[in-house]
Amino acid sequence: MKKLKINYLFIGILALLLAVALWPSIPWFGKADNRIAAIQARGELRVSTIHTPLTYNEINGKPFGLDYELAKQFADYLGVKLKVTVRQNISQLFDDLDNGNADLLAAGLVYNSERVKNYQPGPTYYSVSQQLVYKVGQYRPRTLGNLTAEQLTVAPGHVVVNDLQTLKDTKFPELSWKVDDKKGSAELMEDVIEGKLDYTIADSVAISLFQRVHPELAVALDITDEQPVTWFSPLDGDNTLSAALLDFFNEMNEDGTLARIEEKYLGHGDDFDYVDTRTFLRAVDAVLPQLKPLFEKYAEEIDWRLLAAIAYQESHWDAQATSPTGVRGMMMLTKNTAQSLGITDRTDAEQSISGGVRYLQDMMSKVPESVPENERIWFALAAYNMGYAHMLDARALTAKTKGNPDSWADVKQRLPLLSQKPYYSKLTYGYARGHEAYAYVENIRKYQISLVGYLQEKEKQATEAAMQLAQDYPAVSPTELGKEKFPFLSFLSQSSSNYLTHSPSLLFSRKGSEEKQN
């Protein structure tokens, strides 16, 4: 999969073209009878989306996601509240536009020649390719030529249907497929890993995130080249919403907000490692339950799951771990660092975790205040790995090479240069293994994504199982299942082998529709 990147050039060109086309409607705040005026009079921006880890998701009741965050900022830009409606599939999204139930679709939708005949696209903000997926261990097709409707199923409204039809007409006359009107792409990927379906097609970003929780999902081949992703709004004579979107994205591009959001949601990399991810998820089941209380106890200012990811990157949750350089323990502390933190036994898991957190907090406190709050942790982790002085060198090098020293996206690209003589010879603190610091932070981010998604899935599986058990045994209510006298989790561990493995996802699907007011 190609590196994901916001298409700034496309935004710039589109801005110029649309500015000319939309010039009569640019002063949209001054009109009383246009789409923007209607949104402001209503006091809310109605956005329809789908539930995926990238577009819209929730943790502890709090919404997040790339499209959600952009939509929230756009609503703030317009001075209105955001109303989010979550639909099951893409067809339902466009129904919302057709029926006047949405102002915008913000759901990672691909720009497509057929779609723009009936709907107004906005600026593009990243790109994806469409890929055929299968389950590891099953037959991997090398071509679409002989795939049949019994093997290949796609979601309703999926843009790839047009591409498949073109391929059938021009290259693979035997190709056939079916559309499942009741399921979205995420649910079809679940069916593939459950063995209910041979193949489906999804976009490369969705697949990459899905694999963090389900490494058994594999890419067979690319169906399309990279395609721009955009929002859609109604296509009519009123261009005020398009003009507002254009202004909004230009402003986000110019002040660096788009780059920061790209790094936040797409910056975890796309170099998926099946064995590493599978090994990590097995450790989540086998080792994490004993360590979780310690991570929760000492996490303090950071999410405990991030702390767990850091510890796994350091030692694979092995309290006895020792490296050739002499660092030891769960958080792999040097002897000098441990002494400065008052640690008497580096191989004691609690002492190591407590000390590691304090050391990380010290690094956090040194990160310049000019660095955005949600990026400070990455600078601190780089400093944790290679030393604070070398992190300062990385920032200085970034500034010298016309990057933004306060942007993690810019700084991390310069980290490998710290080990190259033409660069480190001119830096204050000299040589550093910057490439290792880069990999260190990237790995932690991947482990965190996997852990958050996997724990969410297990929680939902437990809830579903509880409800099913209550139906099977009506005398036991769902609330009773969590009490000591009915050890539900123990029951599950004995009765369901899937409970202790990365079994089919519930994280990536939401049936029906939901509405959230923000």
From Swiss-Prot:
CDD domains: MLTF-like, PBP2_YfhD_N. One of its GO terms (molecular function) is peptidoglycan lytic transglycosylase activity. It is found in: Cell outer membrane. It catalyses: Exolytic cleavage of the (1->4)-beta-glycosidic linkage between N-acetylmuramic acid (MurNAc) and N-acetylglucosamine (GlcNAc) residues in peptidoglycan, from either the reducing or the non-reducing ends of the peptidoglycan chains, with concomitant formation of a 1,6-anhydrobond in the MurNAc residue. Its EC number is 4.2.2.n1. One of its GO terms (cellular component) is cell outer membrane. The keyword RNA-binding does not apply. Murein-degrading enzyme that degrades murein glycan strands and insoluble, high-molecular weight murein sacculi, with the concomitant formation of a 1,6-anhydromuramoyl product. Lytic transglycosylases (LTs) play an integral role in the metabolism of the peptidoglycan (PG) sacculus. Their lytic action creates space within the PG sacculus to allow for its expansion as well as for the insertion of various structures such as secretion systems and flagella. In the N-terminal section; belongs to the bacterial solute-binding protein 3 family. In the C-terminal section; belongs to the transglycosylase Slt family. SUPFAM superfamilies: Lysozyme-like, Periplasmic binding protein-like II. Residues 270-518 are annotated as: LT domain. One of its GO terms (biological process) is cell wall organization. This is Membrane-bound lytic murein transglycosylase F. Residues 1-21 form the signal peptide. The gene is mltF. Residues 22-269 are annotated as: Non-LT domain. The lineage of its organism: Bacteria, Pseudomonadati, Pseudomonadota, Gammaproteobacteria, Enterobacterales. SMART domains: PBPb (SM00062). The N-terminal domain does not have lytic activity and probably modulates enzymatic activity. The C-terminal domain is the catalytic active domain. Keywords: Cell outer membrane, Cell wall biogenesis/degradation, Lyase, Membrane, Signal. The active site is at 314. Its main location: membrane.
